[in-house]
Amino acid sequence: MEGRLLLLETPGNTRMSLAYDEAIYRSFQYGDKPILRFYRHDRSVIIGYFQVAEEEVDLDYMKKNGIMLARRYTGGGAVYHDLGDLNFSVVRSSDDMDITSMFRTMNEAVVNSLRILGLDARPGELNDVSIPVNKKTDIMAGEKKIMGAAGAMRKGAKLWHAAMLVHTDLDMLSAVLKVPDEKFRDKIAKSTRERVANVTDFVDVSIDEVRNALIRGFSETLHIDFREDTITEKEESLARELFDKKYSTEEWNMGLLRKEVV
């Protein structure tokens, strides 16, 4: 089977990037070619659909440090992004509404991709991938999370998207968390920092090398030949409309707007 590979990113505008993700998914029709998209975001925090920004992140800290706030179309928790993490999404036809099997299949593709790079990765929770930590050489024992994901589905189509930490600023990632009491900030930030890791903590690779491994891993796991393509006029038009009416508005990004406007 042939698929579409989209290298479509707007690093300086995370909100526009999310509009593209939703537009590509909503434009997809059952039987269309599967889509694999790669993109990055400059410093920003993306909250999940059901979250309220002021409850999840330190808005004052974000403002002082020039970090953009955005809210995505799917659920899940708040995620910090910068140019050191790699985002990717998959849209494909579906005959069922089983979201669990979707996450398992996508996680399998990611794990296979990371093993191409020489990483001993394995699925963590349903929506993330971790790397075992060597207790003899690492201070923190256990597992460290390097990727989280979210998804959506409707009749005939499924969307899955993920963010992988390649060489992200993990100190900044920890600092943007919302902490109820200021005196606990350092403790919670340290705890968060100890639970996550970059791919480059384990292997010396570039963003491009990780992307190429993911293309190969998804192609082999899903049995799809992804070929580079461009966004369609329909997808572009819907993305612009979604950005203007939803993703660019404070009501949406703060988590106060619940109804669909497009």
UniProtKB/Swiss-Prot annotation:
Pathway: Protein modification; protein lipoylation via exogenous pathway; protein N(6)-(lipoyl)lysine from lipoate: step 1/2; Protein modification; protein lipoylation via exogenous pathway; protein N(6)-(lipoyl)lysine from lipoate: step 2/2. One of its GO terms (biological process) is protein lipoylation. One of its GO terms (cellular component) is cytoplasm. CDD domains: LplA (cd16443). Disulfide bonds: none annotated. Pfam families: LplA-B_cat. Keywords: ATP-binding, Cytoplasm, Ligase, Magnesium, Metal-binding, Nucleotide-binding. ATP binds at R72, G77, Y80, D85, P132, K135, K145, A149, A163. Residues 30-226 form the BPL/LPL catalytic domain. It is found in: Cytoplasm. Its main location: cytoplasm. Its EC number is 6.3.1.20. The keyword ATP-binding applies. It catalyses: L-lysyl-[lipoyl-carrier protein] + (R)-lipoate + ATP = N(6)-[(R)-lipoyl]-L-lysyl-[lipoyl-carrier protein] + AMP + diphosphate + H(+). In contrast to E.coli, where the lipoate-protein ligase is encoded by a single gene product (LplA) with a large N-terminal domain and a small C-terminal domain, the same activity in T.acidophilum is dependent on two separate proteins, corresponding to the two domains of E.coli LplA, respectively. Part of a lipoate-protein ligase complex that catalyzes both the ATP-dependent activation of exogenously supplied lipoate to lipoyl-AMP and the transfer of the activated lipoyl onto the lipoyl domains of lipoate-dependent enzymes. Can also use octanoate as substrate. This is Lipoate-protein ligase A subunit 1. It comes from Thermoplasma acidophilum (strain ATCC 25905 / DSM 1728 / JCM 9062 / NBRC 15155 / AMRC-C165).
